[in-house]
């Protein structure tokens, strides 16, 4: 047996543990129009169950799903007027969480209240506010409006929903600073990559091309396209990305939503969608086709991410190079949503900017692509 004279210190992975609480902030639970079909909808989120329904004016409401009478599931009930009726005993609950009627009883219990969740509808999607302390959202936390969305300047949303098991939401948020994974996982060539953190907002600015040796998604349809992406997380779970796709002298502007909400502390629902801004000469059908093409490409990319998450370890102490970006700063920023408001510290919210020097990475990547192309040509 050979015993080394000097023991080399081995770096071990600290997997840590997932937070037991759910993030404070606005969480998108889906397209608003999907909840306006005259039926109640059950949403599993934040370790509980909610029911979403529309009243006669079309306003969406979100309540705890289980009736305070005998625990019936309101999502299995029926919308009656401006109330949701329990399928068990027909108790009627309005959008503010008050019991309005018990049809078989002489009186309605004065203490008949259930939890009504704070909601916001913006850009055609529905948000629910969550805070473990019970605080209400302040105006500066509102999701920004997309200019021209209400005026018909954009296509309709294309939308995809995927349930991710065995991973915490932080896995997808880590992608905000992960420049290198765009090359290895998504087959893109990032030429410029910068992060900006400020308050509750985290930004990612990227300029990229597709790889010449591997064509997937949008690259199949627009092989020479340059992608200019300015993406911002508004809080812990909702990203709005403005993307300019430049190809053959034409610039196409699109908006990407990349959002998620936690189901448990080890599973979440990932949702994403695209709208395309209509340009002169572009028909409604062409704009819709373009949005579908972009969303199909996103679905392929997220499938690549999910395959990584399914088989990786959670890691609290990643070993990094300068080109890996500000991972630890991102996580400090992200932690502000998992502590009480009074425990948010300046290093979680102060402005922080970091631009990755991509020169060494590009040198290596261009060489790898050239070698792959040469091997294919043989």
Swiss-Prot record:
Known activity regulation?
Answer: KSH activity is completely inhibited by zinc ions. KshA is specifically inhibited by Fe(3+), Co(2+), Zn(2+) and Ni(2+) ions.
Which cofactors are required for activity? [2Fe-2S] cluster; Fe cation
Q: Which UniProt keywords apply?
A: 2Fe-2S, Iron, Iron-sulfur, Lipid degradation, Lipid metabolism, Metal-binding, Oxidoreductase, Steroid metabolism
EC assignment: the record states 1.14.15.30
GO process annotations (BP): cholesterol metabolic process; lipid catabolic process
Q: Please explain, per the UniProt entry, the way this protein's activity relates to temperature.
A: Optimum temperature is 33 degrees Celsius.
* Xref: PROSITE patterns: RIESKE
Q: How is the cofactor bound?
A: Binds 1 [2Fe-2S] cluster per subunit. Binds 1 Fe cation.
Q: Which residues bind [2Fe-2S] cluster?
A: 67, 69, 86, 89
pH note? Optimum pH is 7.
Cited PANTHER family: 3-KETOSTEROID-9-ALPHA-MONOOXYGENASE, OXYGENASE COMPONENT, IRON-SULFUR DOMAIN CONTAINING PROTEIN
Its biological purpose? In vitro, catalyzes the introduction of a 9alpha-hydroxyl moiety into the ring B of 3-ketosteroid substrates such as 1,4-androstadiene-3,17-dione (ADD), 4-androstene-3,17-dione (AD), 4-androstene-17beta-ol-3-one (testosterone), 4-pregnene-3,20-dione (progesterone), 19-nor-4-androstene-3,17-dione (nordion), 1-(5alpha)-androstene-3,17-dione, 5alpha-androstane-3,17-dione and 5beta-androstane-3,17-dione. KSH has the highest activity with 3-keto-delta4 steroid substrates.
The protein, known as: 3-ketosteroid-9-alpha-monooxygenase, oxygenase component
Organism phylogeny: Bacteria, Bacillati, Actinomycetota, Actinomycetes, Mycobacteriales
């Amino acid at each position: 047996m050979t015993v080394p004279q000097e023991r080399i210190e081995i770096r071990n992975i600290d997997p840590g543990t997932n937070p037991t609480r759910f993030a404070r902030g606005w969480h998108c639970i889906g397209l608003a129009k999907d909840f306006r079909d005259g039926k109640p909808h059950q949403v599993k989120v934040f370790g509980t169950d909610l029911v979403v329904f529309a009243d006669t004016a079309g306003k969406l409401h979100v309540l705890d799903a289980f009736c305070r009478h005998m625990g019936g599931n309101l999502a299995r009930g029926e919308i009656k007027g401006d109330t949701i009726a329990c399928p068990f005993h027909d108790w009627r609950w309005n959008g503010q969480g008050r019991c309005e009627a018990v049809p078989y009883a002489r009186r309605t219990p004065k203490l008949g209240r259930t939890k009504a969740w704070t909601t916001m509808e913006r850009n055609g999607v529905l948000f629910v506010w969550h805070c473990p302390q019970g605080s209400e959202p302040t105006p500066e936390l509102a999701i920004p409006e997309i200019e021209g969305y209400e005026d018909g300047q954009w296509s309709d949303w294309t939308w995809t929903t995927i349930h991710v098991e065995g991973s915490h939401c932080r896995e997808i948020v880590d992608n905000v600073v992960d420049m290198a994974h765009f090359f290895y996982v998504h087959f893109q060539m990032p030429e410029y990559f910068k992060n900006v953190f400020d308050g509750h907002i985290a930004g990612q600015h990227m300029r990229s091309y597709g790889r010449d040796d591997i064509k997937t998604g949008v690259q199949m349809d627009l092989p020479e396209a340059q992608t200019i992406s300015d993406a911002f997380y508004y809080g812990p779970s909702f990203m709005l990305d403005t993307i300019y796709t430049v190809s053959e002298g034409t610039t196409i502007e699109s908006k990407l939503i990349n959002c998620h909400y936690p189901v448990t502390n080890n599973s979440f629902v990932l949702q994403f969608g695209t709208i395309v801004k209509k340009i002169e000469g572009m028909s409604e059908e062409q704009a819709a086709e373009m949005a579908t093409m972009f969303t199909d490409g996103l679905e392929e990319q997220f499938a690549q991410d999910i395959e990584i998450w399914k088989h990786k370890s959670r890691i609290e102490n990643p070993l990094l190079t300068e080109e890996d970006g500000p991972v630890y700063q991102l996580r400090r920023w992200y932690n502000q949503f998992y502590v009480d408001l009074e425990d948010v510290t300046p290093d979680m919210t102060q402005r922080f900017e970091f631009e990755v020097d991509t020169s060494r990475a590009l040198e290596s990547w261009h060489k790898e692509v050239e070698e792959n192309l040469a091997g294919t040509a043989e």
